[in-house]
Amino acid sequence: MYKRQEVVGTDYNKELVATLNAGKTTFKEDGLDELFNDAVKAGIKFTTEYQKTDMYIVSVPTPYDKFSKKVDACYVVVAIKEVMKICPKGATVVVESTVSPGTMDNFVRPVVEENGFKIGEDLHLVHAPERIIPGNMVYELLHNNRTIGADSKEIGEKVKQYYVSFCQGEIVVTDIRSAEMTKVVENTFRAVNIAFANELARICRHDNMDIYEIIKICNMHPRVNLSLIHISEPTRLALIS
């Protein structure tokens, strides 16, 4: 099922790189240590220097700016600039970071072209948004469905073959803007449902109603599927449908 790939992890944090090269992880997740140990035995390496390869996967933070109410893609742009300093002609850059729709067109493409690269020939751009949640990262990495957005079906299918080597979920190939939008829609849908759950819980508490009983009854409707996925305290509920 798993096709072996040669992998090199890159990070500017020298202490982190040293820790990983020593065979140690820096946080705990179910199944992570076992997976990491297997990767170490298979030859994974970590460095602060970008390497020459045919494919780069960029997974960096995209913080939310509460003042502009926009996602800041500066770390993505910086990472791609570093890649362009070393990558061979025809390399593919896959951005896994969550970005706003239009980020690849409005921020990434201009930078690539300004550096003299012809997109689709010198460098291929792909967006394959991650779909994992802390606490269940390993399972979701292996089993969640994935979306790959590319400028051409050929490149999309090429990248898909890399993901098939570890992802057991369905992998859909589409265009980049659609891939950007699907991740934002997924996150927004979840956020809206959490907000709805909190409001529903507030109303139920105010009127001394049992929210669990209400959800149970509502779920008897063929087009309703409400699920309590997390209760951190009596005043907060997380709900998805």
Question: What spans do the regions from the language model cover?
Answer:
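Single conserved hydrophobic/aromatic residue that forms the stacking wall/gate
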Residues: 1-2, 229-241
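Conserved N-terminal Rossmann-fold NAD(P) cofactor-binding segment
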Residues: 6, 10-55, 59-70, 111-115
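Redox-cofactor binding/interface segments in oxidoreductases and associated redox assembly factors
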Residues: 56-58, 95, 149
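Short glycine-/small-residue-rich Rossmann-like dinucleotide-binding loops
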Residues: 60-62, 98, 152
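Rossmann-like NAD(P)(H) cofactor-binding subdomain of soluble oxidoreductases
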Residues: 64-131
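Internal alpha-helical scaffold of NAD(P)-dependent oxidoreductase catalytic cores
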Residues: 110-128, 132-226
